[in-house]
A protein has these predicted regions:
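Charged, low-complexity intrinsically disordered terminal segments
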Residues: 2-422
Length: 422
């Protein structure tokens, strides 16, 4: 099955630039960041510790709802837009306006603007496919549209820097983040082999304020203006969870998102469960995973199987599986559909969910948006989904892996050379 995704276009353009010598580097020596931490004194202190080190605020009083697949996410998101009273903010990498589900979102945006709601939309200029008719319709209704990082002929290398975020914020009080794009491959009426297995979360409470702040940064980046009346305010507490909203940008200096992952892996004492379509680790993340195994932590990674939207990235990912399995890390390939969930569960208490894949592109190149959630109920729900997905997956065997045909190993090794741009 072929899933038409802009990631393949990005890969092709960037590789072409490398080939013609325009200064992009395939690989370079990087200092390995080795992170260790300790929860020996108090596990309760860890959220504040993580917030201080990443430079992002810790909120409390958040209520999370896990939304498994578009079946659950789309109705909840559309209902929130229909109920909006003051403002709607949306940032998306994938928005295919010709799809049935995107038409429903377009209708909802238009209807909200028509009743006086301030509707602001940020689309990635490469990933989103919005027809001129839909742009005109939304604009005439009063929607404000910004295009992230338009590709310019004099700065063609900027094609490599995208907003990969998937976020919806309503009235500064409720927000949705995760991996689900606005396209029919996430919709319920698609054939199961053409669908994406994915996860979103809905959060009501103070964390929604920080998600809106992340949106405002990119809204300004696209040329938009943030008026005083849309500056986020702290909504009332809604639930028992504490959380840290972490957003990243290639222009933002130290990558707080990557640091959050490394610190969370270092904090694990029992288990680490990772879901990500792509698995391209650098020296720092590989060290953190293997160090966890040395501490006796069980590490399971659930990745895409035969159904993929980017074969070169899949080949590059598979080149690393052997060395990870050799350290005792369990790797499973999801079989029924494309695995697109981006989630990490640590010790059944800490969860990370959002738009970031477990790869270099998400950690170093894309604008991403994730939430770190400290709530056992959320972690248990995500782990339940993880276990169900394992039942539809194939575990890779190290001995069989080492017996792969030479041409397959060579293909994977060649594509792994481009790992830092994937």
């Amino acid at each position: 099955m072929k899933l038409p995704q802009p990631r393949n276009l990005i890969i092709g353009v960037v590789i072409a630039l490398i080939v013609v010598g325009m200064g992009l580097v395939i690989a370079q020596d990087q200092e390995t960041l080795r992170v260790r931490t300790s929860l020996a004194t108090s596990a309760e202190a860890y959220p504040g510790y993580l917030a201080k080190l990443t430079g992002h605020a810790l909120t409390s009083g958040d209520r999370y709802t896990v939304l498994t697949n578009g079946d659950a996410a789309f109705p909840a998101m559309l209902e929130a837009i229909h109920e909006a009273r003051h403002r709607v903010a949306f940032e998306g990498y994938i928005f295919n306006s010709t799809s049935d589900i995107a038409r429903q979102f377009t209708d909802a945006f238009v209807a909200a603007a028509g009743r006086g709601v301030d509707v602001r939309l940020v689309f990635d200029s490469l990933g989103a496919k919005v027809s001129s008719d839909d742009i005109e319709r939304m604009t005439k209704a009063g929607c404000h549209i910004g295009w992230y990082n338009k590709v310019r002929s004099r700065a063609i290398e900027e094609v490599n820097y995208r907003t990969h975020r998937k976020a919806l914020i309503v009235d500064g009080e409720v927000a949705f983040v995760g991996g689900i794009g606005i396209d029919d491959q996430w919709a319920r009426d698609m054939d199961k082999e053409q669908r994406c297995r994915d996860t979103h979360v809905k959060v009501a409470g103070p964390a929604a304020t920080d998600i809106e702040a992340a949106f405002n940064e990119n809204w300004i980046e696209t040329g938009g203006v943030v008026e005083p009346d849309v500056v986020p305010h702290d909504p009332n507490p809604r639930g028992p969870a504490s959380s840290i909203v972490i957003w990243s940008s290639p222009e933002g200096g130290t990558n707080a998102l990557k640091l959050a992952y490394l610190l969370s892996l270092a904090a694990a004492r029992q288990s680490i469960d990772i879901q990500s379509p792509y698995l391209i680790t650098d020296a720092s993340t590989e060290w953190s995973l293997t160090d966890a195994r040395r501490r006796g932590v069980r590490v399971r990674m659930l990745v895409e199987g035969d159904v993929t939207d980017a074969k070169p990235v899949k080949f590059a990912s598979r080149a690393q599986y052997g060395q990870l399995m050799q350290q005792g890390i369990e790797i499973y390939e999801y079989q029924p559909a494309m695995m697109h969930t981006k989630a990490v569960i640590v010790d059944g208490t800490l969860s990370i969910v959002g738009s970031a894949n477990f790869d270099n592109r998400s950690f170093e190149l894309n604008d991403e948006l994730n939430v770190v959630v400290f709530d056992r109920t959320v972690a248990e729900r995500l782990r339940g989904d993880f276990e169900r997905d394992l039942g539809k997956s194939r575990r890779l065997d190290l001995q069989s892996w080492r017996s792969r045909p030479l041409h397959i190993r060579a293909r994977e090794k060649i594509w792994s050379l481009f790992g830092e741009i994937f």
